[in-house]
Amino acid sequence: MNTRLRGLQASDGQLPLSAPHWLTERAFRQGDIPAVRRFTQAFGARRGIRSARLADFVLAVSEAAACATAVGPCTARVRLWVTGSRAFCEVRGNGMLLRRSARGDGRVRAGGIPGEEEAMRRLVLKQLSDYVSVASGPDGVCVLLSMRVA
């Protein structure tokens, strides 16, 4: 299976992708976040990730999935893999997380105001992950994260 991240440049903060040992992916919608958590839990258990780190990874993936689907009905895809002692997650959704304000003075949520929930999700992601990137553009939202699991 091809594990390259399409559409990313080196300057976009692309995660290292050397020979993943496990790769799995799943499509989901906003209401499927509990299923994404179960999917991640099963992935981590099969990979042998320690219980405490697995709980952190499941929470981080759940928050990444929530970020990608936060603004309403959209479809998204979560990809999970392990390389060496690190677990990686990529979540891509076709919704718009952020848009430019009419005055061009900053980015705001698609609903028009900065979201406290979004800020909290990003804080949780930053605290749990060794690396996290959240990007929104015309093609949707992309969340990348990695954490040491061994």
Model regions and ranges:
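Small side chains
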Residues: 44, 60, 65, 87-89
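Conserved beta-strand-loop-beta-strand hairpin that lines the nucleotide-binding pocket
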Residues: 1-26, 69-150
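Bergerat-fold GHKL ATPase/HATPase_c domain
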Residues: 1-58
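Generic non-transmembrane alpha-helix signal with a bias for helix starts/N-cap capping motifs
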Residues: 37, 61-62, 118
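Conserved ATP-binding N-box helix of the HATPase_c
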Residues: 51-76
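Generic structural marker for isolated residues within well-ordered, non-membrane alpha-helices
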Residues: 40, 65, 122
